Amino acid sequence: MRKDIHPKNNLVVFKDGSNGAMFLTKSTLNSKETIKYIDGKEYPLITVEITSKSHPFYTGQQKFVDAAGRIDKFNKRYKKS
């Protein structure tokens, strides 16, 4: 088997951009940004938009979008004259 063909797997902190929740996990991603985690060590930081701590499916806080209003707005904007 060939050596050094697999990506390096290291500990990384993923931070939720919407609520600040942080998760320490293994990943092949890397970042120049670092953060000091709860355990006092520094790890590469990957900021993500949404995680299980902020996604409505996992939190149980459903957000309903006014689809009818959006459709009316679209039709008004692109109505054939």
Curated annotation (Swiss-Prot):
InterPro entries: Ribosomal_bL28/bL31-like_sf (IPR034704), Ribosomal_bL31 (IPR002150), Ribosomal_bL31_B (IPR027493), Ribosomal_bL31_sf (IPR042105). One of its GO terms (cellular component) is ribosome. One of its GO terms (molecular function) is structural constituent of ribosome. The keyword Ribosomal protein applies. Pfam families: Ribosomal_L31. Keywords: Ribonucleoprotein, Ribosomal protein. The keyword Isomerase does not apply. It comes from the Bacteria. One of its GO terms (biological process) is translation. Part of the 50S ribosomal subunit. Belongs to the bacterial ribosomal protein bL31 family. Type B subfamily. This is Large ribosomal subunit protein bL31B. The lineage of its organism: Bacteria, Pseudomonadati, Spirochaetota, Spirochaetia, Spirochaetales.
